[in-house]
Amino acid sequence: MSTNSRAGDAYAYALLKVLFNETKDFDSFSDLVGDVLDFVTIFNTCPSIEEFFANPTYSPIQKKQFLYDFFGRSLNPILMSFLYLLCDTKRIIYISSIISIFLETLLKNTNSHIVEVQTPTGKDYKLDISKLETTLSGWFNKIQKNNDEAVNFLNFDESLVIFTVKEVPGLLGGFRLNFVTDSKVIDFSIAGKIKRLAAVLNY
């Protein structure tokens, strides 16, 4: 086992334990996991962040300052403290592995679902995410009750449904639901309707 993998395992489990111990209910735990996903989204779209963390010429203090400047006002203090700890222990260079193993462990051992809501670009488009979340959460919970094999070591009575929102150019109107965990996409966009109509006309 590589050093990267060993560090990733240890700190990923530590992060999951901290999030569970520091939250008193389902909603707060879900919000914290959502913050982790927000961090992952930015981290994955900005390769220079990983390069910065991996650069040994920058001190732990400089890396912590970067985290504060970039994420300090948007991420939960619990998650920020964990990231600061990684800087102090010089394990921040393994952040990609740690987050990957954390999400893999979370999804494997709980009845969790990640849903990416894809919307058109533009300020004029509005989608009631809270209403959509309520609808899908109820759907997932219904499935959970019918699935005796579901494993949930965190002992929550509800399915953990984590939403991320992604703007997609060219989507026109409507929206798409990308069920990341289940590898499914449901297309409610105008572009999707046009595509289905074209398929019928070309039949």
From Swiss-Prot:
Q: Does the keyword Nuclease apply?
A: no
- Where is it located? Plastid, Chloroplast thylakoid membrane
A Gene Ontology term for the protein's cellular component:
chloroplast thylakoid membrane
> Thylakoid as a keyword?
yes
GO molecular function (one): proton-transporting ATP synthase activity, rotational mechanism
Keyword line: ATP synthesis, CF(1), Chloroplast, Hydrogen ion transport, Ion transport, Membrane, Plastid, Thylakoid, Transport
Q: How does it sit in the membrane?
A: Peripheral membrane protein
Q: What is its main location?
A: plastid
User: Which family does the similarity line name?
Assistant: Belongs to the ATPase delta chain family.
Q: How does it assemble?
A: F-type ATPases have 2 components, F(1) - the catalytic core - and F(0) - the membrane proton channel. F(1) has five subunits: alpha(3), beta(3), gamma(1), delta(1), epsilon(1). CF(0) has four main subunits: a(1), b(1), b'(1) and c(10-14). The alpha and beta chains form an alternating ring which encloses part of the gamma chain. F(1) is attached to F(0) by a central stalk formed by the gamma and epsilon chains, while a peripheral stalk is formed by the delta, b and b' chains.
State its role.
F(1)F(0) ATP synthase produces ATP from ADP in the presence of a proton or sodium gradient. F-type ATPases consist of two structural domains, F(1) containing the extramembraneous catalytic core and F(0) containing the membrane proton channel, linked together by a central stalk and a peripheral stalk. During catalysis, ATP synthesis in the catalytic domain of F(1) is coupled via a rotary mechanism of the central stalk subunits to proton translocation.
| Protein's UniProt name | ATP synthase subunit delta, chloroplastic
